[in-house]
């Protein structure tokens, strides 16, 4: 299940890598444990 760069991701998987190399899921951490606003980005 590919996620394009800029697309939403769950913060747990490296799905962003399968559309282009060195992709990763970047999130904002709220209160140190809640992940929000996760997006696939270029590593």
Swiss-Prot record:
Provide a Gene Ontology MF annotation, just one: toxin activity
Write down what this protein is called: Omega-agatoxin-Aa3c
User: Does this entry carry the keyword Secreted?
Assistant: yes
Its family?
A: Belongs to the neurotoxin 04 (omega-agtx) family. 03 (type II/III omega-agtx) subfamily.
Q: In which tissues is it expressed?
A: Expressed by the venom gland.
Question: Record's domain comment?
Answer: The presence of a 'disulfide through disulfide knot' structurally defines this protein as a knottin.
- Write the record's keywords in alphabetical order, separated by commas: Calcium channel impairing toxin, Disulfide bond, Ion channel impairing toxin, Knottin, Neurotoxin, Presynaptic neurotoxin, Secreted, Toxin, Voltage-gated calcium channel impairing toxin
Q: List where in the cell it is found.
A: Secreted
Q: Which Pfam families match?
A: Toxin_34
Q: Which organism is it from?
A: Agelenopsis aperta
- Looking at the UniProt record for this protein, which Gene Ontology cellular component terms does it annotate, in alphabetical order? extracellular region; host cell presynaptic membrane
Q: Which cysteines are joined by disulfide bonds?
A: 2-19, 9-25, 27-38
Function, as annotated, reads: Omega-agatoxins are antagonists of voltage-gated calcium channels (Cav).
Cell inner membrane as UniProt keyword: no
């Amino acid at each position: 299940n590919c996620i394009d760069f800029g697309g939403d991701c769950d913060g747990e998987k490296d799905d962003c890598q399968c559309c282009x190399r060195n992709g990763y899921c970047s999130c904002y951490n709220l209160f140190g444990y809640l992940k929000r606003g996760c997006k696939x980005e270029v590593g």
